[in-house]
């Protein structure tokens, strides 16, 4: 089996350029295609040159059908609309689809579940080892500490991030909800303003900060009477997400079709 041919979607963006770099540095993987929006000034440029790793002979295009038809996997940190298009194409081509796109709605997730009948999909709000380990710890803490400890999740990202709470914050919220054996949507508290009254019992609160060039910071608070536990993760470089995504793609190659998470890739299931 030769190198895994990977298409980088959103190759002209910050995350896309890092993905190109990491794929080219990873043994057993290569960039076979690079996609960008039709209005991108990067169309026609060599993806490696744009990413700062030298010419790789792959020009950035706007044709996902052609790119996906000639690859083994897709690395997708784009938008929900683009992810849905790529999910359909990846399912048709039976290739691995690694999704780091955030802001996905329940309808989007249902469509991914359907696409996963025909392809390997690895979807996560965060691809880093540290965050996924944090999620496992949050689940255990929520289960162990019990409802007398209030759960609050705070996150901060760069000023250009368009969705809130972040996908990682929601990943951590889902982990906390699982630990408490509750449903996150019906217990999620995302806005406080004015006279809010007392904190709802059993709520999982979210606070989102935006500013500067912050890659990503997350902290989960378990606040009890007389004591507080804080679990945190700080991302200092986008390469941690790219390395996780490439690891997920290589892990998914040859695997049975289905919808997987980074916890599956990292084998975190029942180890904590």
Swiss-Prot record:
Enzyme Commission number, as recorded: 1.17.1.8
Highest taxon in the source lineage: Bacteria
GO-annotated molecular function: 4-hydroxy-tetrahydrodipicolinate reductase; NAD binding; NADP binding; oxidoreductase activity, acting on CH or CH2 groups, NAD or NADP as acceptor
Pathway per the UniProt entry: Amino-acid biosynthesis; L-lysine biosynthesis via DAP pathway; (S)-tetrahydrodipicolinate from L-aspartate: step 4/4
Family annotation (Gene3D superfamilies): Dihydrodipicolinate Reductase, domain 2, NAD(P)-binding Rossmann-like Domain
Biological-process GO terms, alphabetical: diaminopimelate biosynthetic process; lysine biosynthetic process via diaminopimelate
Amino acids binding (S)-2,3,4,5-tetrahydrodipicolinate: 158, 167-168
Keywords (A to Z) from UniProt: Amino-acid biosynthesis, Cytoplasm, Diaminopimelate biosynthesis, Lysine biosynthesis, NAD, NADP, Oxidoreductase
The reaction(s) this protein catalyses: (S)-2,3,4,5-tetrahydrodipicolinate + NAD(+) + H2O = (2S,4S)-4-hydroxy-2,3,4,5-tetrahydrodipicolinate + NADH + H(+); (S)-2,3,4,5-tetrahydrodipicolinate + NADP(+) + H2O = (2S,4S)-4-hydroxy-2,3,4,5-tetrahydrodipicolinate + NADPH + H(+)
Chain positions recorded as NAD(+) binding sites: 10-15, 100-102, 124-127
Location of the active site: 157, 161
InterPro entries: DapB_C, DapB_N, DapB_N_CS, DHDPR_bac, NAD(P)-bd_dom_sf
SUPFAM superfamilies, per the entry: Glyceraldehyde-3-phosphate dehydrogenase-like, C-terminal domain, NAD(P)-binding Rossmann-fold domains
GO cellular component, one term: cytosol
Subcellular location: Cytoplasm
Binding residue positions for NADP(+): 37
Pfam family, one: DapB_N
Enzyme class: oxidoreductase
Function: Catalyzes the conversion of 4-hydroxy-tetrahydrodipicolinate (HTPA) to tetrahydrodipicolinate.
PANTHER family on file: 4-HYDROXY-TETRAHYDRODIPICOLINATE REDUCTASE 1, CHLOROPLASTIC-RELATED, DIHYDRODIPICOLINATE REDUCTASE
Family designation: Belongs to the DapB family.
Name of the protein this chain belongs to: 4-hydroxy-tetrahydrodipicolinate reductase
Organism: Methylocella silvestris (strain DSM 15510 / CIP 108128 / LMG 27833 / NCIMB 13906 / BL2)
């Amino acid at each position: 089996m030769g190198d895994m041919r990977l298409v980088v979607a959103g190759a002209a963006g910050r995350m896309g350029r890092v993905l190109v770099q990491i794929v080219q540095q990873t043994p057993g993987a290569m960039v076979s295609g690079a996609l960008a929006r039709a209005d991108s000034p990067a169309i026609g440029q060599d993806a490696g040159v744009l990413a700062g790793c030298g010419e790789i002979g792959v020009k950035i295009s706007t044709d996902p059908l052609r790119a996906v038809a000639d690859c083994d996997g897709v690395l997708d940190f784009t938008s929900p609309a683009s992810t849905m298009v790529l999910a359909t194409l990846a399912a048709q081509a039976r290739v691995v689809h690694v999704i780091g796109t955030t802001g996905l709605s329940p309808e989007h997730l249902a469509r991914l579940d359907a696409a996963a009948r025909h392809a390997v999909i690895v979807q996560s709000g965060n691809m880093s080892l540290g965050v996924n380990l944090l999620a496992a710890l949050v689940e255990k803490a929520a289960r162990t500490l019990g409802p007398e400890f209030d759960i609050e999740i705070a996150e901060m990202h760069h000023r250009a991030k368009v969705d809130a709470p972040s996908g990682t914050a929601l990943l951590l919220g889902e982990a906390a909800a699982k630990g408490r054996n509750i449903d996150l949507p019906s217990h999620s508290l995302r806005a406080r303003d004015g006279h809010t009254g007392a904190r709802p019992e059993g709520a999982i609160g979210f606070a989102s900060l935006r500013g500067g060039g912050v890659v990503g910071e997350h902290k989960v608070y378990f606040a009890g009477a007389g004591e507080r536990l804080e679990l945190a993760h700080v991302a200092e470089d986008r390469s941690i997400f790219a390395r996780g995504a490439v690891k997920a793609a290589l892990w998914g190659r040859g695997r049975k079709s289905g919808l997987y998470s980074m916890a599956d890739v990292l084998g975190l299931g029942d180890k904590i």
